[in-house]
A protein has these predicted regions:
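The AdoMet/dcAdoMet-binding core of the Class I SAM-like
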Residues: 2-232
Length: 232
């Protein structure tokens, strides 16, 4: 386990909603970080990813994606998590798993630039941290993507992440393959009545997406073309 000092790292809290469902909120209790209805989406995303080999996961949350990853035949499972309350849950969960779990305590934005290990599978689901402000979830993902393609991607590695909007991407097909799957989700109407903020991107849609990138070559062979992701 690797750890280092990061401020503002006790912002999330585990709670139950009025239906006794698990949720993770910010410190105010008014903004939802993760909700129980996301479980089926997370499981579907991991099923599309089909993780193998060495896995890097960003964020633990309620553990939905981590539990799904552990059902596959993997070699190792590295999770980067910064929040103290979430880390406590993660440390209780990790020893009980079938496959080895490596915990890195801190912000992935801090740690990833110096990480040299290569991985076969990636799952990315972060939440804004005040020490690393970003204009959007997409910008967070783009920075993560640009970091891993430089040095962390094995040949035939796959990347999936939580994304609610459809957007265009123009990767060089020599280096990678892009797949976008539609997912119809059942967002409870009562969310808006529970005293928690319904995610803004979910206000008017039941359809979200599961993006999968498959890298045809490893990091050393990709070059600058691998950086050409475009949001549309």
């Amino acid at each position: 386990m690797i750890s280092f000092n990061i401020e503002n790292n006790d912002r999330y809290h585990y709670k139950k909603d009025k239906d006794n469902k698990d949720i993770l909120t910010d410190e105010s209790g008014q903004k939802q970080v993760m909700m129980e209805w996301e479980k089926l989406y997370m499981e579907a995303a991991i099923e599309k990813l089909k993780p193998s080999g060495d896995v890097l996961e960003i964020g633990f949350g309620l553990g939905y994606s981590a539990n799904a990853i552990q059902k596959f035949d993997i070699n190792s499972h590295t999770i980067i998590e910064t929040d103290e309350n979430v880390l406590k849950k993660l440390k209780e969960w990790a020893p009980l798993q079938k496959h080895k779990v490596n915990i890195i305590e801190g912000c992935w934005q801090y740690y990833l630039p110096s990480m040299t290990q290569k991985f076969d599978s990636f799952f990315f689901d972060d939440f804004d941290h005040p020490d690393y402000p970003s204009s959007s979830r997409y910008q967070n993902f783009l920075y993560f993507y640009q970091q891993i393609v430089q040095k962390n991607v094995k040949k035939r590695a796959k990347l999936a992440w939580f994304f609610s909007d459809d957007f265009l991407v123009f990767p060089c097909s020599v280096f990678m393959r892009w797949d976008m799957y539609e997912y119809i989700t059942d967002i409870p109407e009562s969310i808006t009545d529970r005293g928690y903020e319904k995610p803004k991107q979910m206000l008017s849609r039941q359809k979200i997406y599961i993006p999968i990138i498959t890298f045809n070559v490893d990091s050393s062979e990709m070059g600058d073309y691998a950086f050409k992701l475009t949001c549309g």
